[in-house]
Amino acid sequence: AKVGDNLAHHELDICDASKLAAIVQQAKPEIVLHLAAQALVRESYSDPLRTFSVNVMGTANVLDALRHCDSVRSIVVVTTDKVYANQEWIWPYRETDRLGGHDPYSASKTGTEIVVASYRSSFFAAKGVTVATARAGNVIGGGDWSADRIIPDAVRAWSANETLQVRRPQAVRPWQHVIEPLCAYLVLAERAWSDATAAKAWNFGPQTHEAATVREVVGIAQAAFGQGQVQWGDGKDGPHEAGLLMLDTSLAKSQLGVQSVF
């Protein structure tokens, strides 16, 4: 498709502020989507300092480099649905609900939100740069082979004729195909280009009634795979993970025209 013909590709650690700033000055971007992160909850327990370093200070480095770049007009920072102070209740969380973070990953992403809010009000607003955050539900899709992701874990286990270990089968999550939030990020970035009121947090995910338990998702995967043994846990072992999490996505639907399709 020759997609790469018009792309400049650089790989670097966002914790390296000087290299990051140099790349930004070289690229002179107009629209920025910031997705770099340490994105695994369980890894955040084993290495919390790296998680905070990448997600909080790494984001600060990105934003600080961008505030010195006059070409920038639209910035979308992707955080997570886990930034909310989870009450384990049946109501979906709205963008204005209280933030929190029981585990290091969630806390680091809440810190990201605070860093964004500070840079937005302190530096970007006066320059006419719109900075938004995107809070997406659990994503499923090709290319993700990270550990502790339910579908990749299932494929690895069943392909090797092994039993899939499921820690919390009754946990409820706002599952969505990866194409959905990616499209939403692009819509948000486009809106932020021309509309300063987009400078806020946005939830992206399925409708509330489409949220499903881990057991239900594994059942669908089993049917698609055609086989596969599962060992169901009771959620008592291992570090804390939220049991019930849903998002209110009515803001994105009403103001951006974004809603789940798949």
Per-segment meaning from a language model:
Residues 1-31:
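N-terminal Rossmann/SDR dinucleotide-binding element
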Residues 2-9, 126-129, 226-229:
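A short helix-to-beta-strand connector/capping loop
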Residues 13, 158-262:
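C-terminal substrate-binding subdomain of Rossmann-fold SDR/epimerase-dehydratase oxidoreductases
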Residues 30, 42, 73:
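Conserved acidic residues
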Residues 35-39, 79-81:
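Conserved NAD(P)H cofactor-binding loop of Rossmann-fold oxidoreductase domains
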Residues 46-64, 68, 73-74, 83-139, ...:
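Catalytic helix-loop patch of NAD(P)-dependent Rossmann-fold dehydrogenases
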